[in-house]
């Protein structure tokens, strides 16, 4: 079912923001999706900042452009970096340091907490003895999907990633990804020869894996691993995302580039605030 926010246009969002500005004197934080809103609500001061659901990156960018034209102060947009920064620089538009917020969460101790909650200690130790740390194994399995997404965007291939799916290419017992089968399926969806698609993939510039991996891919892949190789549960991608957000520590957020960008925006836009005045430097004991 399509969310109503996904049906908004940038112009409609700007009208909504203008009306909200008349009723709310604090900062307006314009965000892409519902999971972004849930994340930020745990890290902002509600009395000083109101998250606004935009329904996509394009709407955030469009709305911020209108704000930059001099409409009013105190509005900040935050978007996922995806495969590159926004095309037009704006002091009121920030992006994540990696592909998206999930990449930030999965690189933090929140992943360790999720593995304790949903994984099996013995199975995880056995897996890591053979294949290395779960975090590195996860990003290695997410990267082929990320490279396909990047390729599809760069060459306008129009690969339908919902139809492509994720689970058909994994051996659930070993959590092993069949990259050749994945590439062949993607080639079919974009009516290309598999050999040609492999050549295009090989020609992509180098990029850090965490910049390539899409958060929802990673959550689904982690869920597949927890089914047998890492555990005996199937929490589902949605619950895993929620658990990561809840387990994410404030002191880890304060060490991120995104946090520093927000603080810099606050300094330029006083008296508008987004974050608490002080965040503990270490996690509570």
Residue spans for each PLM region:
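Acidic, divalent-metal-binding catalytic cores of TOPRIM
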Residues: 1-285
